Amino acid sequence: MSLEESEVKHIAHLARVAIEADDIPGYARNLSDILDFVEQMKDIDTSGVTPMAHPLDAVQRLREDEVTEPDQRERFQAIAPATEAGLYLVPRVIE
């Protein structure tokens, strides 16, 4: 699949990427190569392949959750400049 210069410019615009005019042919070649590779992958028969979420069949060893610090929420709420319904009130930064 060969991309036109206008298509490369459109892709760059959508990606909000500024590219130089003299770099467009190189980007067109690279993107065309990538799209050709994707087309080749689409032609591969994967009917006998089991779908998987990760290539390695590894199990994560997770530790049990345990409290490591005392709950100091009330203390922090008491010294906060402003709170409401258990939430910290902060100055508005977006108008």
Swiss-Prot record:
It comes from the Bacteria. One of its GO terms (biological process) is regulation of translational fidelity. GO terms for molecular function: asparaginyl-tRNA synthase (glutamine-hydrolyzing) activity; ATP binding; glutaminyl-tRNA synthase (glutamine-hydrolyzing) activity. SUPFAM superfamilies: Glu-tRNAGln amidotransferase C subunit (SSF141000). The keyword Ligase applies. It is an enzyme of class 6 (ligase). Keywords: ATP-binding, Ligase, Nucleotide-binding, Protein biosynthesis. It catalyses: L-glutamyl-tRNA(Gln) + L-glutamine + ATP + H2O = L-glutaminyl-tRNA(Gln) + L-glutamate + ADP + phosphate + H(+); L-aspartyl-tRNA(Asn) + L-glutamine + ATP + H2O = L-asparaginyl-tRNA(Asn) + L-glutamate + ADP + phosphate + 2 H(+). Its EC number is 6.3.5.-. InterPro entries: Asp/Glu-ADT_sf_sub_c (IPR036113), GatC (IPR003837). HAMAP family: GatC. Belongs to the GatC family. PANTHER family: GLUTAMYL-TRNA(GLN) AMIDOTRANSFERASE SUBUNIT C, MITOCHONDRIAL (PTHR15004:SF0). This is Aspartyl/glutamyl-tRNA(Asn/Gln) amidotransferase subunit C. It comes from Alkalilimnicola ehrlichii (strain ATCC BAA-1101 / DSM 17681 / MLHE-1).
